[in-house]
Amino acid sequence: MGCIKSKRKDNLNDDEVDSKTQPVRNTDRTIYVRDPTSNKQQRPVPEFHLLPGQRFQTKDPEEQGDIVVALYPYDGIHPDDLSFKKGEKMKVLEEHGEWWKAKSLSSKREGFIPSNYVAKVNTLETEEWFFKDITRKDAERQLLAPGNSAGAFLIRESETLKGSFSLSVRDYDPMHGDVIKHYKIRSLDNGGYYISPRITFPCISDMIKHYQKQSDGLCRRLEKACISPKPQKPWDKDAWEIPRESIKLVKKLGAGQFGEVWMGYYNNSTKVAVKTLKPGTMSVQAFLEEANLMKTLQHDKLVRLYAVVTKEEPIYIITEFMAKGSLLDFLKSDEGGKVLLPKLIDFSAQIAEGMAYIERKNYIHRDLRAANVLVSESLMCKIADFGLARVIEDNEYTAREGAKFPIKWTAPEAINFGCFTIKSDVWSFGILLYEIVTYGKIPYPGRTNADVMSALSQGYRMPRMENCPDELYDIMKMCWKEKAEERPTFDYLQSVLDDFYTATEGQYQQQP
C-alpha cells in the first residue's frame, strides 16, 4: 500500500517452504507443521522422522558430561520432555538451540529440557543474584519493579568491557525516592575481585556475602537478590501452523475493529494471547507472507509471535501473554493513573528501544499507538501488531479517509500519499508520547479526523500539555517535522529517553 522506502524482503522464495514436504512431529494428540520461517536448528524429532542425511550433533566423548542445575521447576508438556524440580541436576547429552536433551542424575530418565531453565553447575548463572545478558537500563527497570525494595541487588555482565561485571543496588534517596546505584567490579591479575581497593575477594560470591553483612562504603547493605521473573518456556519449534483444537480460549480481554483478543492455553499447558481476526479482514496468503517476516523479528521489547491458525477462518494469531494488557487500557486504569512521570518516560524509552530494533531490521510498523503496545506484570512494554496493518483488506481501513483508519496517529505523507516509512512511524511515536503523558487521552481532543487533516496541512501541531516537561515536548515536535527526513531516528530517540533523567539516575559510583 503506497510507497515503502524502508527495505523489505517481500520476495520470500529462499525461505518459502511447502509444508506438505516438511517432516512433522507426531504427538499423541495432533500433528504439528514445522515453523517454515525459523533459520535456527529445529528441536530434534525422533530419529525415524529426521530428514535424509540429518543427524543429531552428539558431543564427543571427552566433551560429554556437562552438568546443569535447574533454576526453575519444569513440567513436561510433550511425551519426550524431561520434567524436573528446582535444584535438580542433569547431564546434558545433546544441545539443540532452545531445547537440550538431558539425563536426570537422580531419576536417570532422559528427555528434552528448555535450556533457559537451567545453568551449568559451578558458574555464576546458578546464583539467584546473577542476571546474564541484561543491560544497565533493564537492570534498573528490574530493580524498580514491584516486589523489590531498597537493598535489592543484582550482578550483571558489563556492556562495554567483556569479562567484567557490575553491581546494581536499589537505594532510597529522600530527595529523589527510589534510585539505582551502580558499582564497577574490578578484577585482579591473580583472579580476585574488588569494588574498593581496600578489600579484595577471591570470588564474586564472597564479595556478595561480605556486603550482605555490612555496607562498608556502598550506599547500603545488600539484602535480597532482585526478583527474577520465571522465563517463558521456549515455544515448540515444530508448532507454527497449529490445529485450532490445540488452543483453548479462556477469557476475552478485549475487542477491536478487526477482531477480539483472548487469554488462552496452548495444549492446556502454555498461557498465550490469541488474536482472532474477523472473517474477510485479510487474505490468508497475504497474512502468512507477512507473518513469515514478523516471526523473524525477535527482541525483548517486541511481543513474540508464536504460531498461527489459518486453515479456516477466523484466523488465530498466537503470541506471548502480557498480564497488564494494552498500554492504553493500563494508562486509563486506577493502577496506571498512579504511575509518575519518570516511569511514563521509561515506558517511552522502552517503546523507542523496540522501534529502534525494527528500524535496524528495515521493517515498518504502520500502526504504532498505545493500543498496540502491551504491558507485562513487571511493567515492561512490548510492541505488538507490527506489520499487520499492511495486509488489512477492510475498505473502511484501506481507504485512508475511512472511519477505521487511524488518522490522528498517521503522518501527513502517509495519509495523503500512502507513503509509509520508518519516518512515518516516528511521527506516530510522537503521538504515542502524547497518549502516554496524558494517561491515554485521544489526540487532538475535540477535533474530527477531517479537522485534523486540514489543520496539519496548515502546519498545526498539538500544544504542550500541562504536565509535559518542555524537554519531552521538544522531542514530540521533532517527531512531527513536516519533512520526513528531518525527523529523528528511533536509535536517537531511545538514547535521549533512556538518559532523560541523568541527574537522578545514578552514574557509576566512586570507589568507596
UniProtKB/Swiss-Prot annotation:
Ubiquitinated by CBL, leading to its degradation. The keyword Cytoplasm applies. The keyword Ribonucleoprotein does not apply. Residues 1-45 are annotated as: Disordered. Residues 129-226 form the SH2 domain. GO terms for biological process: adaptive immune response; autophagy; B cell homeostasis; B cell receptor signaling pathway; C-X-C chemokine receptor CXCR4 signaling pathway; cell morphogenesis; cellular response to heat; cellular response to retinoic acid. The modification Phosphotyrosine is found at Y193, Y306, Y316, Y397, Y460, Y473, Y508. Interacts with TEC. Interacts (via SH2 domain) with FLT3 (tyrosine phosphorylated). Interacts with LIME1 and with CD79A upon activation of the B-cell antigen receptor. Interacts with the B-cell receptor complex. Interacts with phosphorylated THEMIS2. Interacts with EPOR. Interacts with MS4A2/FCER1B. Interaction (via the SH2 and SH3 domains) with MUC1 is stimulated by IL7 and the subsequent phosphorylation increases the binding between MUC1 and CTNNB1/beta-catenin. Interacts with ADAM15. Interacts with NDFIP2 and more weakly with NDFIP1. Interacts with FASLG. Interacts with KIT. Belongs to the protein kinase superfamily. Tyr protein kinase family. SRC subfamily. This is Tyrosine-protein kinase Lyn. It comes from Mus musculus. The gene is Lyn.
